[in-house]
Regions:
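Extracellular/surface-exposed low-complexity segments
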Residues: 1-3, 100-102, 113, 118-228, ...
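Extracellular repeat-rich scaffold modules on cell surfaces
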Residues: 1-46, 67-68, 186-275, 374-381
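Glycine-centered positions in the ABC transporter ATPase nucleotide-binding domain
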Residues: 12, 31-33, 50-52, 72, ...
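Extracellular beta-strand/loop-rich repeat segments of large surface/secreted proteins
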Residues: 53-138, 204-207, 282-394
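Transmembrane beta-strand segments of Gram-negative outer membrane beta-barrel proteins
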Residues: 202-211, 349-352, 485, 511-528, ...
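Outer membrane beta-barrel translocator domains of Type V secretion systems
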Residues: 240-242, 464-660, 772-774, 779-786, ...
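Residue-level detector of the transmembrane beta-barrel scaffold of outer-membrane proteins
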Residues: 352, 519-523, 564-568, 603, ...
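Outer membrane beta-barrel transmembrane domains
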Residues: 577, 601, 678, 687, ...
Length: 795
């Protein structure tokens, strides 16, 4: 022994933790030598033939240099760096350099005079920091020598935690400074022989994770597991490509989202590659991005995003859609375009567009196809706007080639303000339009009844205050809009509430004499009414019923005249089925309304002749009603609201009795009545965003009539009283409702004729029963037929 060197023999571990200054060198022939202090290795050469571990939590000095022979390993523990002074680091072929790193590790980790590299480099216990994009990739300076580094490691192994598969680390001599050795973050797509992982094209991102590739992805040399030119997206996270990528292989979006932004391009112009979007996955692009190749979509294809207006996403190739295509535009600012420079085939897929529902020039998302359109695609429109009459319509699909007549089918009901929009194929230009237009006489196939036009075209449509979404534009043609069906449901609820407050003295009282002690009575009424709205464009069929109870609470008489005061209450229930006018495509929609509630009231009647009721009479009543209303209308769903009504009536008449020779009597009673009504309903905002109100208002109804009734006597007692009554009714104002300030009215005839017939039978001096059938008719196909049954008991 020379007295100044150290040799490690045997399989065990030797730990040096002192402040050593021997100069003869250190030889490790077997086992493990651990340098636990920064000066544990003295000043001589360290000749490593086994295992050297530097674990001093600081910078270990090895100023004599370190040589690691084939089969041997030199390891730098976490927190330990190495200073070789002016000496060399030699890693022979077959050797291993193992370093442990984290984000706090010092740079450079190894300094010295020179380095000769070979064998394997192993990086342990490291983690790659999450990056938002490849533009944030960083390098770690592993070595910084005084002279250029020679040789290189033959392999790099990264024992990383939480390493995304699309990221790798490559060990390289700095091309700008050959004295430095760098560990550089990069894409697995670009991996080389000295990268930690083999090159591949798979990008896996977990739920909530996102990553952007700003660099250009081009074709690479393939290996046994990858062709060097195909991209696969896995995981629920989002991958964004913002470079003008030139790779020529297929793009397979199997999970999560693949998005193109900025200059994002897949393939070079003329490329025949394919983009395949699997079920449950999403693919799309922002304005100006392009796919050169064929796209097959079984998942979701998105064009544009909510932060853009007027975005164009271009597909230079055919598109087959078996999934969902949707605009990423905000519903308030539509205008994105999916541009397909090729043919389009819909294999049961769907297309969702945002559209401002107005006239022909309204903003909309759009699908543009330079080639042919075939197959079948379900179209869904998310609409905003106040609605307007269209002529040709809003172009939503532009086909440069030939389109089959069933290539696109509108699947949801589209309403705005008063109007219903449908999808139409223009055979002359093969384009598809969203239009609000009714079926004309030329369009009528005769298969179903088309609602009457009701005479004056548009006469019952009041333009809104802002100037005119409702008034049809003058394009020189007779184009009528298709109206939404629930117009009639709202009107029907209002009309039924008003109608079931109406009554006359004889509807309520019959013809029986009432004594001063008063009486109680009950009435049941049921009927069916038919009417139109919006100049015949809406058909309304209503079925209604009413049960009413009343009784006298005060009676006064002086032997000849009498005054009776009473109270009454009723329950009403009415259903209205509303059918909209038929669109030019033959479509027709229905809606239903229901109103039920209660009327509470008082009445007062004066008879000039309390005994026979002949001569003059005056009857008055007041009612207050409160109701629950509902409207059910297709895609708009169900809406509920409350309403109230007040009514005041004043009626007078004069009865003339004519005695017949057989002892019976015929009476003639001319009558006049005036009724004031006030109706008020809550405002409603439906699922389309349309505000429905404007139902508050007053109306006057006047009636002039003649009643004829007879008295058939048995002995001194009246047994049967047949009667008939003819009336002329005049109403001052129509039932109306507003949709986003556009007001429409029911086609209720201002003048109506009414006929009532019936029988009253006196069971005895106290009980009487009466049955009546009544009907009304008028213009605009108005009709009302009802029957009622009355029962009265006199005290």
């Amino acid at each position: 022994w020379d007295g100044k060197s150290l040799t490690k023999e045997g399989a065990g571990t030797l730990i040096l933790s002192g402040d050593n200054d021997y100069s003869g060198g250190t030889t490790i022939n077997e086992g493990t030598l651990v340098a636990a202090s920064t000066t544990a290795l003295g000043t001589g050469l360290v000749d490593n033939n086994a295992t050297l571990v530097l674990d001093a939590d600081g910078e270990v000095s090895a100023v004599g240099g370190i040589t690691t022979h084939s089969g041997a390993t030199t390891q730098l523990a976490l927190g330990t760096s190495l200073d070789l002074g002016d000496s060399a680091l030699i890693q022979q072929d077959g050797s291993t350099l193992n370093v442990e790193l984290n984000s706090d590790s010092v740079q450079p980790l190894i300094t010295g005079g020179s380095a000769t590299l070979g064998g394997d480099l192993v990086v342990s216990d490291a983690s790659l920091q999450a990056r938002a994009s490849d533009a944030e990739f960083q390098s770690f300076k592993l070595m910084d020598m005084d002279s250029d580094i020679s040789g290189d490691f033959t392999s790099l192994t990264m024992n990383l935690t939480d390493q995304p598969d699309y990221l790798t680390v490559t060990g390289t001599i700095n091309p700008e400074d050959a004295s430095e050795y760098l560990l550089t973050e990069g894409l697995s797509w670009n991996a080389t022989a000295t990268s930690a992982t083999p090159a591949h094209g798979t990008f896996t991102l977990g739920a909530g994770d996102s990553f952007e590739v700003t660099s250009v992805l081009g074709d690479k040399t393939g290996n046994s597991d990858w062709d060097g030119k195909s991209l696969t997206k896995l995981g629920a996270g989002k991958l964004t490509l913002s470079g003008a990528n030139t790779y020529s292989g297929d793009t397979n979006v199997q999970e999560g989202t693949l998005w193109l932004s900025g200059d994002g391009t897949i393939g070079e112009m003329g490329s025949q590659q394919a983009v395949n979007v699997a079920s449950g996955a999403t693919f799309g692009g922002s304005n100006g991005t392009t796919v050169n190749g064929k796209v097959t979509n079984e998942g979701t294809l998105v064009f544009g995003d909510s932060e853009e207006t007027g975005a164009i996403f271009t597909l230079n190739g055919d598109l087959i859609n078996m999934g969902t295509m949707t605009s990423g535009s905000s519903s308030s600012t539509p205008g994105n375009t999916l541009y397909v420079d090729g043919s389009y085939t819909g294999n049961g897929g769907s297309l969702y567009l945002n559209t401002v529902l107005g006239d022909d020039d309204s903003a909309t998302d759009k699908l543009v196809i330079t080639g042919d359109a075939s197959g079948t695609t379900d179209l869904y429109i998310n609409g905003i706007g106040d609605g307007a009459q269209t002529t040709n319509g809003i172009e939503v699909v532009d086909v440069g080639g030939v389109s089959t007549s069933d290539a696109f089918v509108l699947k949801n009901e589209v309403n705005a303000s008063l109007y219903t929009y449908r999808l139409y194929w223009n055979e002359s230009d093969n384009d598809w339009y969203l239009a609000s237009k009714a079926q004309s006489d030329d369009d009528d196939s005769g298969g179903d009844d088309t609602p009457s036009d009701g005479g004056d075209d548009g006469g019952n449509v009041t333009p809104p205050d802002d100037g005119g979404d409702v008034t049809p534009p003058d394009h020189g043609g007779d184009v009528a809009p298709q109206y939404r069906a629930d117009i009639g449901a709202y009107m029907g609820n209002q009309w039924m509430a008003r109608n079931l407050q109406m009554q006359t003295l004889y509807d309520r009282e019959g013809s029986q004499y009432r004594n001063a002690d008063g009486s109680v009575w009950a009435r049941f009424k049921a009927g069916k009414a038919e009417s139109e709205a919006v100049s015949g464009n809406i058909d309304m069929d209503s079925n209604y019923s009413q049960f009413q109870l009343g009784g006298d609470i005060l009676a006064w008489g002086n032997g000849q005249q009498s005054v009776t005061v009473g109270v009454m209450a009723s329950y009403i229930n009415a259903d209205t089925d509303s059918t909209g006018n038929r669109g030019a495509d033959g479509s027709q929609f229905t809606s239903s309304g229901n109103v039920d509630g209660y009327n509470l009231g008082v009445y007062a009647t004066w008879f000039a002749d309390a005994q026979t009721h002949s001569g003059a009479y005056v009857d008055s009543w007041y009612q207050y009603g409160f109701y629950n209303n509902s409207v059910e209308s297709g895609d708009a769903g169900s809406e509920s609201y409350d309403s109230t009504a007040n009514a005041v009536s004043l009626e007078t008449g004069y009865r003339y009795d004519i005695a017949l020779s057989n002892g019976n009597t015929v009476s003639l009673t001319p009558q006049a009545q005036v009724v004031w009504q006030n109706y008020s309903a809550d405002s409603v905002k439906d699922n389309y965003g349309t505000r429905i109100d404007g139902q508050d208002g007053d109306s006057w109804t006047t009636r002039l009539g003649l009643r004829v009734d007879g008295k058939l006597y048995k002995g001194s007692r009246t047994v049967i009283q047949p009667f008939a009554e003819a009336n002329w009714l005049h109403t001052s104002d129509d039932v109306s409702v507003s949709f986003d300030d556009a007001t429409v009215k029911q086609d209720l005839p201002a003048n109506r004729a009414e006929l009532k017939v019936g029988l009253q039978a006196d069971i005895d001096k106290q009980w009487s029963v009466r049955a009546q059938v009544a009907g009304q008719t008028g213009s605009n196909d108005f009709g009302d037929l009802n029957g009622s049954l009355n029962l009265r008991y006199n005290w």
